[in-house]
Amino acid sequence: MPYLLAAEADKIQEFIFRSSRLREVVGASQLLTRFCQSVEDTLAKRYNAQVVVNDGGSFRVIFDTGEQAVAFGADLAELYRLALGGSLTVAEPVELNGNFRKANDEAGHKLRWAKSRLQGVMAEPHMPYVAFCASCGVGLANTRGRLKGRRTAQRSQYLCETCQTKTAERDRKPRALL
C-alpha cells in the first residue's frame, strides 16, 4: 500500500532573512529552491519515490512502503541540516488509500502536530571566546565599547575594528588609515 510523507523546513523566514543586517539579502530563496529540486533528482530516485510537492521548503512524497517513507524522512532531514544548516520537521507517513486529498489533509495535520512538539536538541556550532559585532552583526568583535548617539549608549557592546573606525570617523575623531 502506498504512503504519503509530509516534511517542512523549520523557521523558514529566519533562514531567508538571517543576513538582514547586511545591505542586501541575496540567494537564500534560490538556495532553498535548488535544494528542493536536487532532492527529486537524487534522494527520491534512490528510494524510488514519487515527489508531489518539493518547493519552498515543503515536501510531499509518495512511497511504496512505510519503511521507505520513514528512512527517506530521516535522510532528508539530515541532508537539509548538512546542506543548509537548518532543521526540517518530518511527519509520520500516512496511508494513501486512493484519496490523495484526504491523505494530504491528514499528513498536514500530522505535520502541524510534529512541528508543535519539541523534537530534540539541535547542536549549534559556537565559539565560546568569540563575539560578533553588535553594530554590523558580521565582523568578529575585538573590543567592548560604547556607541555614542544610540539609545544603548549606557551599555557596552562588542565592536569590530571596522565599526570602531566608522564610529570614530562619524564622531570626527578619525584614525590613521595607513
How would you label these PLM feature ranges?
Residues 1-178:
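Regulatory and interdomain segments flanking nucleotide-handling catalytic cores
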